[in-house]
Amino acid sequence: AAPVEFTVEKGSDEKNLALSIKYNKEGDSMAEVELKEHGSNEWLALKKNGDGVWEIKSDKPLKGPFNFRFVSEKGMRNVFDDVVPADFKVGTTYKPE
């Protein structure tokens, strides 16, 4: 299993996605996280807020399921496809297959 979990946080809706990302790698953490909407070729950067939650805010509804790409502090790169579904629920944790 992948060493990462995505939990949808409060404030998430059709235009906003807020995620707690748990990365289970000793001594390493997320440096950059990007999201790609369903049917898109464009990666969009998430910003980390003061609470350690990664957020993306959009002017128009986001289209899931969502793919994620990240770079860790130690330079580990990974892409996870279709992790968070279009009908995500706040408080639910999603893990890549």
From Swiss-Prot:
PANTHER family, per the entry: EXPANSIN-B3, OS04G0328900 PROTEIN
Coiled coil segments of this chain: none
Location(s) in or outside the cell: Secreted
Record keywords, A-Z: Allergen, Secreted
GO biological process: plant-type cell wall loosening
Family listed: Belongs to the expansin family. Expansin B subfamily.
Pfam families with a match to the protein in the record: Expansin_C (PF01357)
Protein's recorded name: Pollen allergen Lol p 2-A
